[in-house]
């Protein structure tokens, strides 16, 4: 990791972040700072809380497409017209095979399914897959199964897995990206999961037309909810989705690399003691600037995403090593 030298103003922000004294306006004002200053502050906070480590995770789209929800960014929604592979829940053998294929590189493996939630039968099969992975690999298991009820959350607690449920954006902006469920539906699941004692991963997507204020409000909600890991995604608009059309016709401006990096840094500063993990869209948005995001990150999703291809894993490993980090 590079040597960190903070100027007096940056040092003050660093100290306020560490002591939890940055308010909403303070975080919004960070947008006006130079990117290099934000990277320096973020890097200092990362070094304080997580040293030089980058935690790697991988996901599997274990059930794809035909989702009844109307999220405008998602190629799996039946309300969009994206051409993707659709299939029912994969077998435990297929899921285990996928997990084993990334075990050499990843610390975590997440089973992700499309839909608002899972049926009882699907849930039973997923529990079997969790047991297979835990018994036959060294991977920590995560699941992203939608809006789960208390009984299913308790069953997952018994299996010692981490739950993933993205808030996606701020409460104020959520109605612009989805109306088939609301923000509070997700909040209720997160609160119940935390009450039961589950580890929780949640986050959002940058580049859907939201403001910096919306991003800061998302970070503050994640802090208030006490999530353990924060998953940040950069919008990669997929043909056939409603948001692709909005960008095509200039209704929404696509996110650029500087915008994305600043947002990642502000997430780090707002949530200094959380695992900040960069996931989908980083290759599309950051391109050659991906390496700079590592100064603000504790985690990176590697391999393929739900319906899009990720960067070659060896390229990610090389990038991490060249930037002076460990995994």
Curated annotation (Swiss-Prot):
Enzyme class, broadest EC rank: transferase
Keywords: 2Fe-2S, 4Fe-4S, Biotin biosynthesis, Iron, Iron-sulfur, Metal-binding, S-adenosyl-L-methionine, Transferase
Pathway: Cofactor biosynthesis; biotin biosynthesis; biotin from 7,8-diaminononanoate: step 2/2
Gene3D superfamilies according to UniProt: Aldolase class I (3.20.20.70)
Residues engaged in binding [2Fe-2S] cluster: 110, 142, 201, 277
PROSITE patterns linked: RADICAL_SAM
Annotated positions binding [4Fe-4S] cluster: 67, 71, 74
MF annotations from Gene Ontology: 2 iron, 2 sulfur cluster binding; 4 iron, 4 sulfur cluster binding; biotin synthase activity; iron ion binding
Residues of the Radical SAM core domain: 49-273
Listed name of the protein: Biotin synthase
Gene of this entry: bioB
């Amino acid at each position: 990791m590079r040597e960190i030298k903070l100027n007096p103003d940056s040092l003050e922000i660093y100290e306020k972040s560490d002591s939890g004294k940055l308010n909403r306006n303070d975080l919004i004002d960070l947008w006006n700072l130079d990117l290099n200053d934000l990277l320096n502050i973020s890097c200092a906070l990362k070094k304080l809380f997580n040293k030089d480590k980058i935690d790697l995770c991988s996901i599997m789209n274990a059930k794809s497409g035909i989702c009844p929800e109307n999220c405008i960014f998602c190629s799996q929604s039946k309300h969009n017209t994206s051409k993707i592979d659709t299939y029912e829940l994969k077998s435990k053998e297929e899921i285990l095979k996928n997990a084993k294929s990334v075990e050499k590189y990843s610390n975590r493996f997440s089973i992700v399914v499309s839909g608002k939630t899972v049926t009882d039968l699907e849930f039973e099969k997923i529990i079997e897959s969790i047991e297979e992975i835990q018994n036959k690999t060294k991977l920590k298991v995560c699941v992203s199964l939608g809006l789960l009820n208390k009984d299913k959350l308790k069953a997952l607690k018994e299996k010692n897995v981490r739950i993933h449920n993205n808030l996606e954006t701020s409460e104020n902006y959520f109605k612009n990206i989805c109306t088939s469920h609301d923000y509070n539906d997700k909040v209720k699941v997160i609160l119940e999961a935390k009450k039961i004692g589950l580890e929780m991963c949640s986050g959002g997507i940058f580049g859907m037309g939201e403001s910096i204020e919306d991003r800061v409000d998302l970070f503050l909600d994640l802090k208030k909810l006490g999530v353990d890991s924060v998953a940040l995604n950069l919008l990669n608009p997929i043909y056939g989705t409603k948001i692709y059309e909005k960008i095509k016709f200039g209704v929404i401006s696509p996110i650029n690399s500087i915008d994305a990096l600043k947002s990642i840094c502000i997430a780090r500063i707002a949530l200094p003691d959380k695992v900040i993990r960069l996931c989908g869209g980083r290759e599309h948005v950051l391109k050659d600037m991906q390496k700079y995001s590592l100064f603000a990150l504790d985690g990176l999703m590697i391999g393929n995403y739900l319906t899009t291809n990720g960067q070659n894993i060896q390229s990610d490993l090389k990038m991490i090593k060249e930037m002076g980090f460990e995994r």
